């Protein structure tokens, strides 16, 4: 378990019984090169996901913060070197100034790459949202997180899950008193499909735009407890202003 992830989840122990909420349960193995904006954050091991939004910036979750991060782009099987991967150290790691490790509000992080990524068939960018997505929108969630709701199985190959965004009312009803206006829920109230440990920071892509960041949840794929995601449409101005100030 990673110390800053412990901090994030101890802060809300009732809601976050596990160390880092970043896996896919009930999904499928993504087709190779089908999620070229997905990155792996590495500190000698994969610990979180992220999304490439331009050739030098990645969006992830603030609770994924570590002092030193290597961003791995073009990954599919994270257990082997396949050729075409790009490993680039972070030169700046910027958490949202109002991030709360207690509530996980404003759970968003920007990473500047030390050198620009080379955009190609394996590595490309995901657009920021032009507007907030509505409930019912089908989205693609991806990551290398745990694939079991009970037990542990971390896959080598990138996993995908198609899931709908839920209404704010359903989200609040699932987690009374814990959902802020900066959070969205996605998934299935009946359970069985969800993100989980190892997927944190990864993308929720809806109609070609980054609408969510894997943030937290109660367990994984539990009935009545959908995944909770950072609502990226609330942060477009902050992202653009932060990039401009650190270019």
Curated annotation (Swiss-Prot):
UniProt keyword annotations, A-Z: Calcium, Digestion, Disulfide bond, Hydrolase, Metal-binding, Protease, Secreted, Serine protease, Signal, Zymogen
Active-site residues, Swiss-Prot/TrEMBL: 63, 107, 200
PANTHER family per UniProt: TRYPSIN-2, TRYPSIN-RELATED
Modifications made to the protein after synthesis: Not sulfated on tyrosine residue(s).
UniProt EC number: 3.4.21.4
Catalytic activity: Preferential cleavage: Arg-|-Xaa, Lys-|-Xaa
Name of this protein: Anionic trypsin
Names of the cofactor(s): Ca(2+)
């Amino acid at each position: 378990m990673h110390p800053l992830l412990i901090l994030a989840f101890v802060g809300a122990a009732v809601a976050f019984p596990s160390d880092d909420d970043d896996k896919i349960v009930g999904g499928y193995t993504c087709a190779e090169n089908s999620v070229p904006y997905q990155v792996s954050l590495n500190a000698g091991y994969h610990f979180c996901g992220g999304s490439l939004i331009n050739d030098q910036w990645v969006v992830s979750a603030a609770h994924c913060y570590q002092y030193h991060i290597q961003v791995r782009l073009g990954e599919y099987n994270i257990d082997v070197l396949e050729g075409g991967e790009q490993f680039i150290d972070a030169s700046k790691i910027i958490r949202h100034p109002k991030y709360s490790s207690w509530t996980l509000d404003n759970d968003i992080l920007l990473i500047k790459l030390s050198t620009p990524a080379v955009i190609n068939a394996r590595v490309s960018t995901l657009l920021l949202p032009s507007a907030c997505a509505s409930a019912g929108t089908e989205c693609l969630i991806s990551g290398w997180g745990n694939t079991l709701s009970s037990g542990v199985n971390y896959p080598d190959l990138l996993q995908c899950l198609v899931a709908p965004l839920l209404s704010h009312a359903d989200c609040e009803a699932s987690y009374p008193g814990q959902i802020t206006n900066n959070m969205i829920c996605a998934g299935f109230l009946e359970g069985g499909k969800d993100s989980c440990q190892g997927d944190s920071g990864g993308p929720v892509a809806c109609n070609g735009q980054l609408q969510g960041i894997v943030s937290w949840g109660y367990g994984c794929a539990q009935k009545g407890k959908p995944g909770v995601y950072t609502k990226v449409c609330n942060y477009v101005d902050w992202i653009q202003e932060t990039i401009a100030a650190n270019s």
